Structure formats: structure tokens, C-alpha cells
Amino acid sequence: MNSVLGNQTDVAGLFLVNSSEALERAVRCCTQASVVTDDGFAEGGPDERSLYIMRVVQIAVMCVLSLTVVFGIFFLGCNLLIKSEGMINFLVKDRRPSKEVEAVVVGPY
């Protein structure tokens, strides 16, 4: 019985070693550099033109987002400025002149 148990652990150890080696072989086999097309030529990563197009699209998207943020902040600031001017005008209309102001205004007449 001990010999059977010992054999099972040895087999399990060999399986683990072989599985890690098999995994390494599979990873090395399936890299992007080793992909072969129908013509038989190995195709590398993305070509230079597609990288250029991706970069231009990224720059365009970042410009649009930046302009959106800048104009959003600008219009928010303008809106707050208009509201604050309206509040100031509202407060000025509700203020009552003091008695000293009336005395000064009435005095020269």
C-alpha cells in the first residue's frame, strides 16, 4: 500500500512538472511574433500605419475632451457670474437708504 501511495505522489509531482513545462511551451508557441498567415509569412505586430491612425484618433479624442472641459468651466463661470450680478442687483434694490443719506440729499435743496 505504501508503494502505491508513493507512486501516486511521484506521478503527481511529474504531472505538475510536466504541466508547467507544457504551459511554457504553449505560451512560447502562441506569441504574436510566431503567428503565420495564409501566405506562409510571419506577421508581426500591428503595422506602422495602423499605429499612426490609432495615435491620431487618441489625439483627436483628447482634444475634444479637453475643449469640452474648458468650455464647460467657462460657461459655468459665466453662469455663476450672471447669477451673482443678479443677486447683487436684487440686494441693492431691497436696501433702504439710511436717514443720513436723506438728510444729505434734502440739505442742499
UniProtKB/Swiss-Prot annotation:
Domain of life of the source: Eukaryota
Keyword Heme part of the UniProt annotation: no
Lineage: Eukaryota, Metazoa, Chordata, Craniata, Vertebrata
Residue ranges of the TM segments: 56-76
InterPro entries: Reprimo_fam
Function noted in UniProt: May be involved in the regulation of p53-dependent G2 arrest of the cell cycle. Seems to induce cell cycle arrest by inhibiting CDK1 activity and nuclear translocation of the CDC2 cyclin B1 complex.
Record keywords, A-Z: Cytoplasm, Glycoprotein, Membrane, Phosphoprotein, Transmembrane, Transmembrane helix
Mode of membrane association: Single-pass membrane protein
Record-listed Phosphoserine modification sites: 98
GO cellular component: cytoplasm; membrane
Note, other: 'Reprimo' signifies stop/repress.
Subcellular locations according to the entry: Cytoplasm; Membrane
Source organism (scientific name): Mus musculus
Glycan-bearing residues: 7, 18
Induction, as annotated: By p53/TP53, following X-ray irradiation.
Gene Ontology annotations of biological process type: regulation of cell cycle; regulation of mitotic cell cycle
UniProt name for this protein: Protein reprimo
Entry similarity comment: Belongs to the reprimo family.
